[in-house]
């Protein structure tokens, strides 16, 4: 009853609402990793840009590091297979690109900022019009489209319409030698001669190639390949004097343009004489004075038909066959300054992108700056280390440089696009810069370090734990084997193992399950599937120590426990010898291995490097280990005494006879009470109006209740309200939270050391750390605990504070189970607040983290909030003195910067919530991950600055920003060359409609205002409600569901302006779009909106004077008449202005402009 009397409590003020908008904003920013299921590749040698299309309809353009553009195709007939990008063709030098989808639809894309927008679309119907090849003219005005029917169509890129003449295959057949009597088949390749722009070289499917002359509209020369069957394609040299023609039987030959006779080596099969597979792509260039042929495929069909290879053959006899572990999608070769000198080979594979130096006869690999294969080995866990200090970051870089010594030093050839000038940072900022490092654990036992501070996801180090496990006979140097050329017999292709993708693991027990990393010291702890915990660091010690090994048994012979799972991993015996060489892994010192028995998977870990302690949990209990002295501290078994089986299968539970009998009596009593007359019953208040879902208490004997879910080291108030003590907190699946008090001996220093009288120092005795159980909490609902965090009065987590800092008292502990949050006071453990997520939202908590949020606001707003007692969650970490009664305070040194720490949580539905602490009031709720994406939900991890990363596919990472102060997104742009004749078309339209255009401009200028938030408003107030109620979509995406509405405003207009169009233009000229990535891309429109205007006219005949108008005489009998007219107009896709809202202290984004063009439907 009290909650009804109190009502809803104190509501946040208007200032708080404004502050929430300034602090919290959800948006998808950048994408990292390798595109999922790539299907097409294209390279622009003029602007030096690379484009990749995927089977899911994604289109990505890459230039120099930092220049990334995203686009997304949309569904036509609700079939996902139609999104498959089959061909890509650049309009060279303009920045535009053409894509052909499986729906046989041709789309022209144009970059606007960091987004690719589809500006023109052309569908092809009919089987004979199935597009098989594309070729853009050197003059950038035409596109030649080859079809499977054997015809070539010309597409005018300005109007995006088919124009005459069409090169029909029957016309070509009439002009070829009579010896060729076959149907030529589909168009496989079209090439324009660089020295004769009026001539086309066309390769048909069935061994016919013709040189077509547009001036005479005839076949100038025909080339017939005898006995080769199907042709695949051709490539023309830079001089236009010869071309290389390759075929489906694995052969190729170089023909002269001026000589239709076949060359002498027309039957050359590089991997013959056995039948070979098709050559899918071929390039020809030069290395010094030698010719170099690069081709994919062509392997002997019977012996090596399953190999995925790209071969590099030089005329001096040097041959290399790059053997990859995934399918070759396509490749291209970059050349030096429009010459035949080959520089870099870029290969797009199904699972990775590889590049090689063609100027070096050894064909060394090149380390690409982006598109790295995150899933080279399957990713098994993620860990994001925030605020890594500069010294640790440099240590990791030094270790990584030792692994990169075998890569080529040639510069990356794809350097297109431009970056803003403000990206350059000063040396002073770099000295104090903090880094974000993503650590990914893999199935093969490796841990990869990725620098994710900026837009680029850069691999900086690869730590392998597999080198310390196994027998000596199994061990080999994998790194040397990967980079060496493994030559086979003389008659076979010279294979070389290439690429990093390796989906197979020698031993599944090596898989990494948990990672702990200290951002201030560089201490690394890796937990594996077989209970192994590897301890390593990046500290360069003068004295190296050999590898140590120790095991800790959690169950021993407890109740006859039998482990039915896999065996533990064996450490290599030669590493454990007393005189063994210290174990290092390319710059990292591996100090020891802790084996937890039974060898179950590590479920959670905690690290406190300053104390020298690490704790690990399994399904059977937890261990505490002193890794500095390499001695165990204690272990605790969490198994229920009734557990009689091992964890190799689900833990079985026995129900006691007493409990079974009690439940039987309860069911009996319940059955009697429900046999009364139900028709006379009146529903109670609780039955009539359920307030929330009930959180049912779970049985204590639920399976896997002994699993330790989370561990936490913290120095807080446990036994005394005045003194902090080091503690270890653990929680299980059965909602049991245990608090262990740690006794750390004082560190011995040189000042406290007392020398002996004899002068001989006694042997150093290692410090002993002890632990004892101090308190235990049992949550009633018994839901698994997913996280524990202790924070001070300002809401800052004590485990994120610097060494020696305890935070401002009092401390509070947040315990997050799968169903609810609960806040307790310390040391009394008195409940303060709780938030029932499952009862209110129907979701379960998967992950929690504390993030810091900041924004710039006016000092007046800060002063008003300070005087009005803001919520306790508001706080500032400035240098000003804080009021002990009010958490929110003013920063004296930076009065316009406001800071706040909040709780971030992820649910199993893929939603991310931001809650204030300790009030647990919701500040933001965003649908971040699709609820069906289980891998994405389980892989998501947060940073301390309000960002998140998750696996959007097996190879890609999606970046999310929750804070307005920290947004990492691509800022590079691609210059766009305007289409020719655009200006002349506009001038003609302006000249024809000068009066109407002038009137339109006058009225638009009257009603166009700039609101304080920076959004351009061009609609009249009387019609704002119409635009607000209309539901607008962008490629099937409902704009109203966007989290960032009104961040972008797109103003559109029509090319041909008439009086009616001016009237419709005044009704609604502004369409507001959302900020979206991947599936949601800004402004991908084919139709902006369909507007319907209704005009109502009422005629009262009595008020009309007696004027001799014949048209009105017919209305005399009707007296009062009301007439309603309806008119509709479709505004076609053209974007003239995109203005981004300047909010939350972000830099103002430039306004890209494009010229108006109508789309063809």
UniProtKB/Swiss-Prot annotation:
Residues covered by region (Phospho-regulated basic and hydrophobic (PRBH) motif): 15-86
Domain notes: The phospho-regulated basic and hydrophobic (PRBH) motif is necessary and sufficient for interaction with phospholipids permitting cortical localization. Phosphorylation of the PRBH motif by aPKC inhibits the association of the protein with the cortical membrane.
Protein name: Lethal(2) giant larvae protein
Organism: Drosophila melanogaster (Fruit fly)
PANTHER family: LETHAL 2 GIANT LARVAE PROTEIN, LETHAL(2) GIANT LARVAE PROTEIN
A Pfam family: LLGL
Major subcellular location class: cytoplasm
Record family assignment: Belongs to the WD repeat L(2)GL family.
Cellular localization per UniProt: Cytoplasm, Cell cortex; Cytoplasm
Keywords (A to Z) from UniProt: Cell cycle, Cytoplasm, Developmental protein, Exocytosis, Phosphoprotein, Repeat, Tumor suppressor, WD repeat
